[in-house]
Amino acid sequence: MSKKISVSANSDVKKRILRVVDRTLQTHSMVQYGDAVLMGVSGGPDSVALVHILRALAPKYGLKLAIAHLNHGLRQNASDSDQAFVTTLAEKLQLPLYVDKQDVRLYQKNRHLSVEEAARQVRYRFYLRSASENGYNKIALGHHADDNAEQVLMAMLRGSGPLGLAGIPPVRPDHIIRPLINLRHSELLDYLAYQNLDYVEDSSNRDLQFLRNKIRSRLIPELQAEYNPKCVESLNRTAAILFAEEKWIDDRILPIYEEAVVLDDPVRLGLSLDRLKQEPIAAQRRLIRKAL
């Protein structure tokens, strides 16, 4: 079911949001003029905002836009309603639409994954396949600063290293981009409200069996109330610093990696143990991770 929010929004909201996203696109070289961008859209507020924001910026960059929606089939009728909403949105905006329905539960069972991870893998495979088959060279997703803060906290709780603590990458090697990464979720809601735009709500976002939802609804509010009202901004700042440093280190690891590779064919990759032993343990970890 779609929801329309109504608040008193400042007339500058749209311009400010577009300015932030435009700057993000340029800072991270997310798009080049004439790119074909496939937007992953669930129907929720973040992805709906992504569609309208990129559509507003498309003329400046000569972008060819399309929408991709995966029906996970996890919420029965609600999943079908989400698909219907996204279909209507694409028709209204006259954008090409690519839709698929997958059995995420079966994928989860066969690979012994959590539901959340199984859904993510199936969704990304669908996006990458749809982009490749239909001529789109970029895939845009609606992750924002709150998502990034949650990701950093999840990585911290898992005991991740610097790469995990670097959060959600604004740009991935497989051409996935996140134009909204410098915006708060509340800012996206303001943007939708200002333009009186509909979206759907996913009830699973309130299910506290998922760690991310616990972090969003319990841990972050506690951190904001008791320790740092701007903890989301602080976590994003830490992630940005680590992301930049990781990239710098990775660039310098590459020549060592190329020296260490002794076997590289479509099904196998081998590293020289003797060459690895010449490097400190931190470099060894990075080299092995790069090979994987």
Language-model region placement:
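Generic N-terminal leader/processing signal
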Residues: M1-S2, K277
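Core alpha/beta nucleotide-donor-binding catalytic domains of modification enzymes
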Residues: S2-V41, P45-P221
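ATP/NTP-dependent adenylation/nucleotidyl-transfer catalytic domains that generate, transfer
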Residues: F210-L292
